[in-house]
Amino acid sequence: MSDINIKIGLAEMLKGGVIMDVVNAEQAEIAQQAGAVAVMALERVPADIRKDGGIARMSDPKLIKEIMSVVSIPVMAKARIGHFVEAQILESLGVDFIDESEVLTPADELNHIDKDSFKVPFVCGCTNLGEALRRIGEGAALIRTKGEAGTGNIVEAVRQLRQVNKDINYIKNADKSELMAIAKNLQAPYDLVTYVHKNGKLPVPNFSAGGVATPADAALMMQLGAESVFVGSGIFKSADPLKRARAIVSAVTYYNDAKILAEVSEDLGEPMTGINCDFEKFSQRGW
């Protein structure tokens, strides 16, 4: 078992950057060239998982090793919710982070992975503060919004990040005598609720994911308080992946500078084809 503070420290190093989904070594090299702080190795981006249907599982270890061999930046990989054996395999490969991801088909509808039993740090998604604190209680070192991956639609990520921020502000301003009741209502560990009350933030970095397709989307999430951004289908489902990837990296760096945002948003070609969120929602997987 690894010290959670070491894991959180590794996650802190990704702040202010972009983590990009890649499905092969060539895309991984493009992501690194564009300035990504990490890549997420997977066989299909979320848009294709939605399109193809079926059961989405951990990627082939051969693919993950190929991607790890061509980049020097951290490599993440996804395991199904509750599938601790997939996580054991990924840890044995030497990935830098494991994402216990709702994008893949859940393996356990009741239990998430005991992340404290692993040396590798875990990323987990949330839709609200209670969900975030439950994952942190299990050992997650990094939290992200779930959004709605594969849609190119930012609305759910915005809703979720605003909800987390609203919940944090409520707890920060609550009377200490109310914290146990709040913990009960959130179904969250009491010690983590008291941490939020004292510090006004999560005890781990808080990133955004799910639906980021443009530089403006990325800057929006940063202005709303995200500390970094995951981009899945939005880059390599667009007309010019390298140019769009560089633009999104710049947007995360200069998220408060509208002039730079306007410049990097010019002439990017067609973005990914977006879809509405009126269908099965990946964000409802897990609890």
Curated annotation (Swiss-Prot):
Residues binding D-ribose 5-phosphate, per UniProt: D21, G150, G211, G232, S233
GO biological process, one term: pyridoxine biosynthetic process
Pathway annotation from the record: Cofactor biosynthesis; pyridoxal 5'-phosphate biosynthesis
Reaction it catalyzes: aldehydo-D-ribose 5-phosphate + D-glyceraldehyde 3-phosphate + L-glutamine = pyridoxal 5'-phosphate + L-glutamate + phosphate + 3 H2O + H(+)
Lyase keyword on record: yes
Cross-referenced InterPro entries: Aldolase_TIM, PdxS/SNZ, PdxS/SNZ_N, RibuloseP-bd_barrel
A GO molecular-function descriptor: pyridoxal 5'-phosphate synthase (glutamine hydrolysing) activity
Catalytic residues as annotated in Swiss-Prot or TrEMBL: K78 (schiff-base intermediate with d-ribose 5-phosphate)
This protein's UniProt keywords: Lyase, Pyridoxal phosphate, Schiff base
Positions bound to D-glyceraldehyde 3-phosphate: R162
Signal peptide limits: none
One family name in Pfam for this protein: SOR_SNZ
Superkingdom classification of source: Bacteria
E.C. designation(s): 4.3.3.6
NCBIfam families: PRK04180.1 (NF003215), pyridoxal 5'-phosphate synthase lyase subunit PdxS (TIGR00343)
Subunit structure and binding partners: In the presence of PdxT, forms a dodecamer of heterodimers.
Role of this protein: Catalyzes the formation of pyridoxal 5'-phosphate from ribose 5-phosphate (RBP), glyceraldehyde 3-phosphate (G3P) and ammonia. The ammonia is provided by the PdxT subunit. Can also use ribulose 5-phosphate and dihydroxyacetone phosphate as substrates, resulting from enzyme-catalyzed isomerization of RBP and G3P, respectively.
Family according to the record: Belongs to the PdxS/SNZ family.
Protein name per the record: Pyridoxal 5'-phosphate synthase subunit PdxS
Organism placement in taxonomy: Bacteria, Pseudomonadati, Pseudomonadota, Gammaproteobacteria, Thiotrichales
Record gene name: pdxS
